């Protein structure tokens, strides 16, 4: 509901839904955000604080897709709570932070889409079994390549992953 869009159907009903939802956010937004932050902290403890894992979870690890969602939700809740103060709500993230967040989101989604496609199921663990295949797809590596060069591309992909989650983790800490 925080990022709802009217794709089809009655605009009047959609606007009424949005109005009622905003009223609920005004009443309970602080509590909702605190609950989301508590969920995040529990998830990070369950998954582990060490986000430099060899086989990371693209969705649940610290700095991953869940944290990006938390940032977006936090911004949307803040905007709803401060609807009359557009300057404040539009300045929550700098242009550089927005660009960094978008870049992280796009890279993590790219990894996750390739992972789902190659594993032929919902899968969020970037295991060794898929790292070579995904790096080949991302960097368009020719089939015939030395193991050393192949490892270079896997390392490049993982380095980009770590950079993305580090950036997201740093932005998430603004909200926690």
Which residues fall in each region the model found?
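A nucleotide- and high-energy phosphate-metabolite-utilizing enzyme signature
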Residues: 1-176
């Amino acid at each position: 509901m925080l990022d709802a869009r009217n794709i089809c159907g009655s605009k009047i009903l959609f606007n009424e839904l949005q109005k009622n939802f905003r009223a609920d956010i005004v009443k309970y937004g602080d509590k909702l955000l605190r609950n989301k932050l508590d969920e995040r902290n529990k998830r990070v403890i369950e998954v582990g604080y060490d986000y430099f894992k060899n086989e990371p979870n693209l969705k649940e690890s610290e700095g991953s897709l869940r944290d990006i969602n938390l940032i977006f939700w936090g911004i949307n809740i803040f905007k709803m709570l401060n609807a009359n103060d557009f300057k404040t709500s539009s300045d929550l993230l700098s242009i550089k932070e927005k660009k960094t967040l978008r870049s992280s989101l796009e890279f993590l989604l790219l990894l996750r889409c390739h992972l789902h496609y190659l594993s032929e199921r919902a899968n969020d663990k970037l295991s060794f079994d898929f790292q070579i295949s995904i790096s080949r797809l991302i960097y368009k590596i020719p089939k015939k390549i030395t193991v050393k060069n192949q490892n270079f591309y896997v390392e490049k992909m993982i380095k980009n992953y770590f950079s993305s989650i580090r950036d997201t983790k740093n932005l998430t800490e603004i909200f926690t």
